[in-house]
């Protein structure tokens, strides 16, 4: 484990259309101590070529290519096995982050001594336009609500 490092986990399957913008949103982060671990799950489009272009420019972007299609959850697990960071963040290949996302989230976690956080996010249209629809974090969540509520597990932005 490398202290302060954020390991960003990104599964990818036929994501060539969006993955460049997603990677760019990581490259633009104001917090720069991160590694981006992208696991390609046997894409049939040119996703791998798009990722390789970024990996050749920035060594923090690391590509793993699977030999068999295993699905997003298993692809995430492959990346987690290679993660070196103190923190793990999930970002899907068709999502983007605000440039201050890591900086703000880490500051919040440190300020309140949290080991796990998630945040509000905007729903985006397929063309990349941000809608006014915001999925908000509940103000409180009991243990039983947490077990019933999958927002922590399904949404990665």
Predicted regions and their residues:
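Nucleotide-sugar donor-binding/catalytic module of glycosyltransferases
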Residues: 1-157
């Amino acid at each position: 484990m490398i202290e302060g490092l954020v390991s960003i986990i990104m599964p990818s399957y036929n994501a060539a259309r969006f993955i460049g913008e997603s990677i760019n949103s990581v490259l633009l982060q104001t917090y720069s101590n991160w590694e981006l671990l992208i696991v390609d799950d046997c894409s049939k489009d040119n996703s791998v070529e798009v990722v390789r272009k970024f990996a050749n420019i920035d060594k923090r972007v690391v590509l793993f290519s699977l030999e068999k299609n295993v699905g997003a959850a298993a692809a995430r697990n492959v990346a987690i096995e290679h993660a070196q960071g103190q923190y793990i963040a999930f970002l899907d290949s068709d999502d983007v982050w605000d440039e201050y996302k890591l900086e703000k989230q880490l500051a919040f976690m440190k300020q309140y001594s949290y080991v796990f956080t998630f945040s509000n996010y905007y729903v985006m249209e397929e063309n990349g336009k941000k809608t006014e629809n915001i999925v908000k974090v509940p103000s409180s969540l009991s243990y039983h609500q947490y077990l019933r509520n999958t927002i922590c597990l399904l949404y990665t932005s």
